[in-house]
Each structure stands twice: as C-alpha cells, then as structure tokens.
A protein has these predicted regions:
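ATP-dependent phospho-/nucleotidyl transfer catalytic cores
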Residues: 503
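Accessory carbohydrate-recognition regions in carbohydrate-active enzymes
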Residues: 21-437, 443-498, 509-532, 538-575, ...
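Short aromatic-glycine motifs in intrinsically disordered, low-complexity regions
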Residues: 706-715
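Bacterial Sec-dependent N-terminal signal peptides
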Residues: 1-23
Length: 756
C-alpha cells in the first residue's frame, strides 16, 4: 500500500490537527503560496493537487475573453504552457489534468464550469470574470462575478471534487470536452445515469508530438444532486458544396436532451441543469485514469467515495503537511519561509504517479502493466538531472528510489531509458542522455536499492549503439571525432557534445562503483572530449565543422533569449562556457589558470550574459568556489540572484519552473549548499538565509535522522567567516554527500565583509 493511501486512512482521525495546532508551531502548509510562478512564464498554476497527484483541478483562464479579442496571454496566440496566468481576468472553467512548470503545452482538459440561466456551450459566451481567489495546498476557491457563484475545489491523487454554491434559479454544471490547453482533439461522452457521465479526452501534443502519439485520458464524473434536465452538445464540422445540402445542422451546435448513447467528436460536452428555489450547493466528483473508464470509476470510489468536501480537503492537506515537514525552518522572516515552502511544494508535484489505485498503468509500449509499488511519470530529465534528483535523494529517498525504478521499468518496456517522458510517451524533447546521470548520481549517494547492473547495461546501450539511437543522435561522429560537428544535422552540436560528455562521465562513475575499472577509464576519458571544441582565442567552446575547421563567423552572444543559432540549445557560447561540471579543474587549466577563469566568470555576470531562467548556466554562481580566495563571490552572487528573482509574488520565479528545478535552485541557496557536479556526490557551500533549519531525514536511509543548519543570517551578514561541522572547524567549501548526511549540525558564522 503506497504512502498516500496510508495517509488517506489515517487522515480523518487527525483532520482537526491542523486547526488545533498551537500558534507557536504554525502549520507548514500555511507558508505555501501556490500563486508564485503564475506570472513571468513560471507556468505553475494555483489549482488543487495532492503530493505527486495524477489529477489536479486548475482554473482555466487562457482562452479568448468574452469580447473575442485576443488577451495578452492566450494559449493559442503564443507559446503558453499553463492553464492559468495571473494577469488574465476571464475564466472558462476548471481543468482536471494539468502540468506544472513545463515548457510545452499539453493536457489542461476535462473542463467543468458552473453557470446560471440559459445553457451556453461556447466558452466565450459562458466564461466569466472572477474575484476573491484563494489557494492553499490541496485547495482553490474563486467567485465568478457573472453568476454570483462561489466555487471550491480539492483533490486526491487520482480524483477531484468541486463544490458550486448556486443562487436560486436556473443553474447548470457544464463539462466541456472540446476546450483544452492541448492542441490534440477528440473526445467521447456518455450518460450512464441522470447524475453520472463517463468518457475520454484525447491529449498528447506536447512539444510538437506526432499525431500517432496521442492517447486518451478516461474519466467518470458525478454530481451530488439529480438535475431537472441533462444532455449533451456537439458542434458539427462545417461542410461546403454538395455535402452541405444533406446537413441541416451544418457547422452548428446541436443539443440533445436525455441522450444516453455515447457521443463522439472534437467539440462536445455535457450538462446538468437545475431549477433551485433557494441557494443550493452542488458537488461534482471526477475520477481519472489513463487505463480505462472502469479504473477511473474505481479511483473515484476508492479515494473519495462518500467522503464530503471537507474530509477530502483535510486528507490532502494532511498529506501535504507530511511532505513539506521534511524541512523545519526557524526564522522571523515570514516572507522567505513562504518562498522556500512554496518552492518545496512546487517541486513535489512532478514527477507524479501514473498508476491507478489498483496498480494498473499504461506501459511505454502501450500495453497495460501492473505495479505493486509506484509508477512515476513526467521525467523532464534535461532539467532535473542538474539539482532536482539530488534534493530528493537527500530529503525523500523513497520517492527518489521509486522514480529510479520507474525509469528502469520504462527501459524494460521500450528498450531505452527516458529522456523527456510524459504519461508513458517519450517526447524526445531537449538533448543529451540525462537518465544515465540521474541513475549514477542516485547510486553514488548511497541509494542502491535498485538493479544497478540493469541500470549500467541500459546506460551503456545509449552510449554505444551506433545506429537508430534515439537518445544520442550523431553518436557515431561523436565517438569518432570526439565532438559533434555543425554538418550532420544534430541540434546544438556544442551543447549536445557537452551533454554526452556529462553522461559519459556518469557512466564512468557508475562503472567504477560497480568494479568495472577498464570501462570506468574509457568513459571518463571520453567525457573530456569537449576540449576539442575549446577555442583559446575566445576562451569559449565554439562550433566546428566535420573537417576540424572552426565554424565562422562566430558570435558568442548569439543564442541568448532562445535566439536561433548554430551551436547551442536554448543558450549561447557564454551560457555554455562552463558547463563541464565533471572537469572544472581541467577547464581552469584550459582557460589559462585561475585568474583567467575568474575573469571569464565575471564577464558573464557583469555583462548580463548569465541566464537565471534556464538550466545550462544555473550552477555558475557556485563556480567561484573552485578558486581559493574567490568564494565570497559565490556568496554575493547567490544572494543577489535570490533577492532579484525569487519573491512571494506571482512573478516570484525567474521563469519556467521546469518541474521544480528553479524552485530547487532557490531552496539550495537558502539552505547554504548546492550539488555543483552531477554524478559526483558532493555539495559546495554558500551562505544560508535562515538562522536555523532542521532537515528531517528518512531514518531508513540516513541513520542520524536530522541535520541542523545554524547561522546568524538574521544579523544581516551574507559572507561566510567560518564553518563548523559537528563542532569542528571545517576548512573546505566542498562537502561530500556522506559527510553531510552523517553530520548532526552544520554551523555558519556570517559577517558583513567578504573573507578573501
């Protein structure tokens, strides 16, 4: 039985605990602001979700407004990957499957909407302005101004519940299966009783996925009161010429009351309509599954059943309280605590579970599988290998192990490790071979409860398969020349060479840990081939032709802000200049020594070449720690970036949260350490931002159970003067994962002046 099921069983017994806590120990969830990241393209949403939930209920406000004019942030007018944007003012319903902090649009479907008066089926007609939004972990509420309806929503991992406060008169619950964030189309809906519908909605358009990769989300929806009227609608395709003569409803929307057969189409929906003599509450319960309608119904019955709204909300908030209590912060800075816990909240959304209550799930090959444990999905690995999985290896090792085992199951089913997997569909978004890095990093941090030999075999397959290799395009040239050229059609050949190098280093680390000395030597040597692209004239990595000549003309600045360029993915030569975390000492030598290394780093920060909103350079503020006497620059720069980009406001993220990676960066900066080198179990220090933090570790993995991080941060100093580990002076700015986890206390003395 999984952790969340156990939480559901005990939650009712402790549901009053949150409200009864003494004021001296405020509930952790009260420090979460789900609106952080809903502006500035953070791509989060304030909807209700359980930890690692497969279902979430989010307000949907990214369609055109009621006048039909284009709103500033509308889903089809630009690249918008979220169902909700804080600046928008026109709400057209509540979605039941969503993604958080991703860079491509998908899901955002199964949209419910309460209305009054005549039934309208076009969202431009029935949408409403809104006010009085409130969001907490597991809960969201809003008032619809057009109708005078208050709506509250909550969710479990696989089911959701909405509560609509209708005024007297004609009221309606709409279920729109045509509208959605995804660009995929197609749906089915059927009434199985006056109060229950079942159906499916097609999704799967993530990052230009092909039509062949579309897949269904199944659902069951129930209302708490039997309606006076019910039915479906379908908007028909518009035909011209002879075909149009045979269709009296050509291009029109037809309403079918009391229609009990299945209806199929691209723009369909259902409605429940009431005539209330007095204000009345109607509840809508929805269960989902990626396996079948039957499983969606079972998920709904097992997780919600006859429970009322308050019970469901309290169960989920109790689960969030447990999840977020892995970190205890003692500080008078309420704002920073809210920023931190909101980040931990956002990082606990994806990867999310993909299996049903009974253990069924869709395998990567399309078959139905079964697990007695957990099956996770949404592996944004190009992002998360850099810092996310290290954080969860430390704070939530069981969850990290479940993710690793899910990745190995994907390998069993598809023959390849994941790259950017979504709902058992490999999207092949971004570049590199990031799964290998995550597997090695997890193992080297002491989480070894997975089939390491299988993992090593899978890692080598992607590194050695020369033909039809979906994970490493251009692998043959890479192995022959030691780099990818601009002539073979591989995206971002410089960036991709660097990514392959980091993955090769990880494979070498794994080989060494497993006792394969020769393979360790081979892969670690291979991981240094980025040096073939180092141009001493610029002290940067530069694109090359297959014949060994430099690509010209070379503009190191080209590629910033997603500008198209020849050599790099989502960046330019400056933003990739130091992305060789496994060979920082070697890079220092290549650049001509420590002084030139620091000069080049300062060039990035002093001349606005650093991009806090994307992954390739996010470790750069910590690289000053590799040069003795320059560590203060790391402390200064991390502090500046935290203050500039992380706020307790909707625009409180530097950009797309990338399934929690940007939030993880912030949390490390506030805690005072960062995993600067993936596949190396080390951290490097910076100045913490709280006087006391207790990390409550899982004693099944970390025997000490707790690590205290102490500092005098509240006195205003941001520069490290001294560090103590368990009472002894610690003279290095680097600490291994093992030493950190075995420590009971790490104490920082901070001051106003840098220690040079």
């Amino acid at each position: 039985m999984n952790q969340f099921k156990l939480t559901l069983l005990v939650a009712l017994l402790s549901s009053l605990a949150i409200g009864q806590q003494k004021s001296s120990h405020q509930s952790v969830i009260e420090y979460v602001n789900p609106f952080i990241g809903t502006s500035n393209y953070g791509a989060t949403n304030p909807g209700a979700i359980a930890p690692r939930g497969m279902l979430s209920i989010s307000p949907f406000n990214v369609a055109f407004d009621a006048s039909g004019r284009e709103i500033p942030l509308e889903k089809d007018s630009q690249w918008l990957s979220t169902p909700y944007v804080h600046e928008n003012e026109f709400l057209t319903g509540f979605t039941h499957v969503n993604l958080s902090g991703v860079g491509c649009p998908d899901l955002g479907v199964i949209i419910s909407m309460p209305t009054t008066g005549e039934i309208k089926t076009n969202h431009l007609d029935y949408g409403s302005a809104y006010e009085n939004e409130k969001a907490e972990p597991g809960y969201y509420s809003v008032d619809l101004k057009k109708y005078g309806i208050k709506t509250e929503v909550t969710a479990t991992q696989r089911a959701g519940m909405s509560r609509f406060y209708f005024p007297a008169g004609t009221s309606n619950v709409l279920l729109n299966l045509g509208l959605g964030l995804t660009n995929e189309q197609g749906a089915m809906l059927k009434f199985v009783s006056p109060t229950e519908v079942e159906g499916l909605r097609m999704v799967g358009s993530f990052c230009y996925n092909s039509e062949e990769k579309a897949y269904p989300v199944y659902f069951v929806a129930k209302v708490s009161k039997e309606p006076q009227r019910r039915g479906i609608w379908k908007k028909h395709q518009f035909y011209e010429g002879l075909e149009a003569q045979w269709m009296g409803y050509n291009g029109e929307t037809r309403m079918k009351e009391n229609f009990s057969r299945a209806v199929v189409g691209d723009s369909i929906g259902g409605y429940f309509s009431y005539n209330f003599k007095q204000p009345t509450v109607v509840e809508l319960k929805v269960g989902i599954s990626y396996v079948s309608i039957e499983n969606a119904r079972e998920n709904l019955e097992k997780e919600i059943g006859e429970k009322n709204f308050t019970q469901v909300k309290m169960m989920t908030q109790r689960a969030w309280e447990k999840q977020l209590s892995a970190v205890e912060i003692e500080s008078d800075d309420e704002n920073k605590k809210k920023i931190f816990y909101s980040g931990l909240y956002h990082a606990s959304i994806h990867p999310n579970i993909f299996h049903d209550f009974n253990g069924d799930y869709v395998k990567s090959n399309g078959e139905i599988g079964h697990t007695e444990g957990e099956r996770y999905t949404v592996f944004s690995l190009w992002d998360t290998y850099r810092n996310y999985h290290q954080l969860f290896s430390l704070l939530y090792p069981k969850q990290q192990m479940q993710m690793v085992n899910s990745m190995l199951s994907i390998y069993d089913e598809s023959g390849w490790l994941p790259k950017w997997e979504l709902n058992s569909t490999e999207t092949f978004t971004m570049v590199g071979d990031p799964a290998a890095i995550v597997l090695a990093d997890t193992y080297l941090r002491g989480l070894t409860q997975f089939d390491a030999e299988k993992a090593f075999t899978a890692m080598k397959k992607s590194a050695e398969t020369l033909e039809d290799n979906p994970l490493r395009p251009g692998i043959k040239e890479y192995l022959e020349k030691g780099y990818l050229s601009v002539d073979r059609g591989v995206s971002g050949p410089v960036s991709t060479t660097q990514e392959y190098n980091i993955a090769d280093f990880a494979i070498g680390q794994m080989a060494e840990a497993l006792g394969y000395a020769e393979e360790a030597k081979k892969y670690k040597k291979q991981s240094l081939s980025y040096r073939n692209l180092f141009d001493k004239e610029f002290n940067l990595l530069r694109p090359k032709h297959a014949n060994g000549n430099w690509y010209s003309p070379f503009d190191p600045d080209k590629g910033a802000n997603f500008e198209k360029n020849v050599g790099y993915i989502e960046g330019n030569a400056w933003q990739y200049a130091f992305m060789v975390p496994h060979d920082m000492r070697g890079l220092i030598q290549l650049m001509g020594g420590e002084k030139k290394f620091v000069k080049q780093l300062n060039e990035i920060f002093n001349n606005q070449k650093f991009d806090m909103a994307n992954e390739p350079d996010i470790a750069y503020p910590y690289l000053f720690n590799y040069v003795k006497g320059e560590e203060w620059r790391t402390q200064k720069k991390v502090d500046e970036l935290l203050q500039k980009y992380y706020k307790n406001k909707p625009d409180g993220l530097p950009g797309n949260d990338d399934t929690g990676v940007m939030s993880a960066w912030m949390m490390y900066g506030m805690l005072g350490f960062y995993p600067v080198a993936p596949a190396q179990p080390i951290y490097t220090f910076t100045s913490p931002k709280f006087d006391k933090v207790t990390l409550n570790l899982d004693t099944d993995f970390h025997p000490n159970g707790k690590i205290e991080i102490l500092s005098n941060a509240s006195e205003g100093g941001k520069y490290i003067q001294q560090i103590w580990v368990d009472g002894k002076v610690y003279k290095s700015y680097f600490i291994t994962d093992r030493v950190l986890k075995n420590a009971r206390q790490i104490r920082f003395e901070l001051g106003e002046n840098p220690k040079k």
